């Protein structure tokens, strides 16, 4: 049943080509825009408060990534969330580096409190810190294992009514009703900057067509990362191959490679 849901979501993204509004960081804008295009969605990077109400009126979802956060960005992000709420759109929050600084932690929590329909996508240390527990991180990199964040994820589900995607060697999708485990991916993936941010952007595309759990995006990127690594000499070629494999991914390959339970 889970596999069929994932396939249906992939089909819907490619048929509907949803517009995804991204307020994201300077490091990954190109990566995430290309990934959205490759999977079949339509990205737009919208950072001006003057256009956000209009953008959210006709977009499919809002992605907020705090990777290069500053005091100018926070009010825009909060305003965008309010507009997403007004239009009954899902907000996907990537709390990059949450726990590394007070600013990142407090801003992540403020955005999470504001959003009516929320998916949180982060690594284990970010999820643990967002839940108010003691996390182990080095900047934006996680030192905690993904399974160590399961309790924190369940706290976030309860506190914010969110669905939570924990990225790591094993990915977990946590909702109020279930915990789904994904065992795809490749050890080379963390050596490409913005891989988690790419997953967050893809989560926005799938949320726009009805997958408000985050499952389909995590499944697709895990399988694609695994396939891409097989023909990659290192992180540089992996990044390039990833876009090609997102574009080329067919349903039969996804069914054959997917490790979900």
UniProtKB/Swiss-Prot annotation:
InterPro entries: Hyethyz_kinase (IPR000417), Ribokinase-like (IPR029056). Gene3D superfamilies: 3.40.1190.20. Its cofactor is Mg(2+). It comes from the Bacteria. Pfam families: HK. Pathway: Cofactor biosynthesis; thiamine diphosphate biosynthesis; 4-methyl-5-(2-phosphoethyl)-thiazole from 5-(2-hydroxyethyl)-4-methylthiazole: step 1/1. It is an enzyme of class 2 (transferase). GO terms for molecular function: ATP binding; hydroxyethylthiazole kinase activity; magnesium ion binding. The keyword Nucleotide-binding applies. Keywords: ATP-binding, Kinase, Magnesium, Metal-binding, Nucleotide-binding, Thiamine biosynthesis, Transferase. This is Hydroxyethylthiazole kinase. It comes from Vibrio atlanticus (strain LGP32) (Vibrio splendidus (strain Mel32)).
